[in-house]
Amino acid sequence: MYIADILSDLLTQQTTRYGWIFMVTSIAFSIILLAVGLNVLSQLLFRRPYEPPVVFHWFPIIGSTISYGIDPYKFYFDCRAKYGDIFTFILLGKKVTVYLGLQGNNFILNGKLKDVNAEEIYTNLTTPVFGRDVVYDCPNSKLMEQKKFMKTALTIEAFHSYVTIIQNEVEAYINNCVSFQGESGTVNISKVMAEITIYTASHALQGEEVRENFDSSFAALYHDLDMGFTPINFTFYWAPLPWNRARDHAQRTVARTYMNIIQARREEKRSGENKHDIMWELMRSTYKDGTPVPDREIAHMMIALLMAGQHSSSSTSSWIMLWLAARPDIMEELYEEQLRIFGSEKPFPPLQYEDLSKLQLHQNVLKEVLRLHAPIHSIMRKVKNPMIVPGTKYVIPTSHVLISSPGCTSQDATFFPDPLKWDPHRWDIGSGKVLGNDAVDEKYDYGYGLTSTGASSPYLPFGAGRHRCIGEQFATLQLVTIMATMVRFFRFRNIDGKQGVVKTDYSSLFSMPLAPALIGWEKR
């Protein structure tokens, strides 16, 4: 009792002196301390032997969120060294199971539809941006039909016209861009490539009318849509936050613009003029039940088409230019490759679709950039049924989210010796610097044509399985054409004697160069 009386007197004195601030602070600190203690004890004393090991963390709910968010790849490799290829971490209160390596990629990316689900993970993020009844806001069977409609338009005949459109857009941009006036200067290359990729994609895939709308105001609307892809919107997509209000206004405005273009096309019957673009393909498409694709859904798919491809192409093209600035010798090799193929007479002849496959070093530069800078570092799926992990004792419960990270595999020394070195020549035939990339590429029709199911390759920049990117061929065409055109015009270099490239910004869902990504340029 004596000790209790002393403590009571001390508490009374402190409360009198500092008031309720001291009391509230003491209680809050005690609660936090208790929560941390119970969280640590639960990890040490109540391990579940039939679930993957949980990454140790001090704070409940927060878990490993901060270390994962700062650098996902470092987090994955550190955890793999300690726990193995499969482990679970706490991400804002959710249990997230990561399964790395070839087996992990196959387990998740080729998981059965009844076992894993992408829609429940991404719909809160994508539906406010794209619009209703498309992509992840519809049954998977309908999504497969939508992908088939768009894939049908990506024909070889269309690709021939796309190369000319893209080259002309890049040349027009270079000639008109304030940042490229004069004979030399510096430029924020990420900003430039974001504009070039959206101009080229909108013109090639969606037609001249759409491209004509991409003035500064329309580009600003797409920027507002882009801001809707912030990670916080996985949970707070509904919140009346400033960027969400701007997102919703932009979505309505852009969708209305597309619907006006669609209506004008129907009235003018401009099918022949626009036969190569995806908008026209959707306008004449019909679902399996006989329902024509509604104009509203076409408009929403047009938004999805640009937004989904824009991040990947913008990021990848920026990394290409940054690496060429860091390695001017490789940029000169690219120029020499074009001299060998097209001759030394200037100006070079216009690029043709058939030329792209001859530009082998250009292709290898793209491959090496995608290997080191996969646009998406974490591919997520919701577990719908308990999943047994083959060859282990583990069963993944339905309360977990799964993550596959093909980008980890492409940075694994097992398959790519000296994996963090940027070396386009590792892809040269016979170099011996790419291992395990000769797996048989199995194909399956998920409802939108034969698609690669193979996840056994260590190099999967476009994913695998039913959600594999349908735009791989177009993205390759677009990026190689942009690269070849830029090489014809410029020499790039790092500024201020810097070595290598800028670090990666992981604060968004896509692995972008950390801003500002400045490089020096000089016209040839």
UniProtKB/Swiss-Prot annotation:
EC number, as in UniProt: 1.14.14.154
The keyword Chaperone belongs to this UniProt entry's keyword annotation: no
Superkingdom of source: Eukaryota
Key words of the record: Heme, Iron, Lipid biosynthesis, Lipid metabolism, Membrane, Metal-binding, Monooxygenase, Oxidoreductase, Steroid biosynthesis, Steroid metabolism, Sterol biosynthesis, Sterol metabolism
Disulfide bonds: none
Top-rank EC class of the record's enzyme: oxidoreductase
Subcellular location: Membrane
Pathway: Steroid biosynthesis; zymosterol biosynthesis; zymosterol from lanosterol: step 1/6
Pfam families found in the cross-reference section: p450 (PF00067)
UniProt keyword annotation of Zinc present: no
Any one of the GO CC terms: membrane
PROSITE patterns in alphabetical order: CYTOCHROME_P450
Residues that hold heme according to the record: C469
GO biological process, one term: sterol biosynthetic process
Cofactor(s) annotated in UniProt: heme
Catalytically driven reaction(s): a 14alpha-methyl steroid + 3 reduced [NADPH--hemoprotein reductase] + 3 O2 = a Delta(14) steroid + formate + 3 oxidized [NADPH--hemoprotein reductase] + 4 H2O + 4 H(+); a 14alpha-methyl steroid + reduced [NADPH--hemoprotein reductase] + O2 = a 14alpha-hydroxymethyl steroid + oxidized [NADPH--hemoprotein reductase] + H2O + H(+); a 14alpha-hydroxymethyl steroid + reduced [NADPH--hemoprotein reductase] + O2 = a 14alpha-formyl steroid + oxidized [NADPH--hemoprotein reductase] + 2 H2O + H(+); a 14alpha-formyl steroid + reduced [NADPH--hemoprotein reductase] + O2 = a Delta(14) steroid + formate + oxidized [NADPH--hemoprotein reductase] + H2O + 2 H(+)
InterPro entries named among the record's database cross-references: CYP450_sterol_14alpha_dmase (IPR050529), Cyt_P450 (IPR001128), Cyt_P450_CS (IPR017972), Cyt_P450_E_grp-IV (IPR002403), Cyt_P450_sf (IPR036396)
Entry coiled-coil feature ranges: none
GO-annotated molecular function: heme binding; iron ion binding; sterol 14-demethylase activity
UniProt record similarity statement: Belongs to the cytochrome P450 family.
Task of the protein: Sterol 14alpha-demethylase that plays a critical role in the third module of ergosterol biosynthesis pathway, being ergosterol the major sterol component in fungal membranes that participates in a variety of functions. The third module or late pathway involves the ergosterol synthesis itself through consecutive reactions that mainly occur in the endoplasmic reticulum (ER) membrane. In filamentous fungi, during the initial step of this module, lanosterol (lanosta-8,24-dien-3beta-ol) can be metabolized to eburicol.
Protein name: Eburicol 14-alpha-demethylase
Organism from which the protein derives: Uncinula necator (Grape powdery mildew)
Gene designation: CYP51
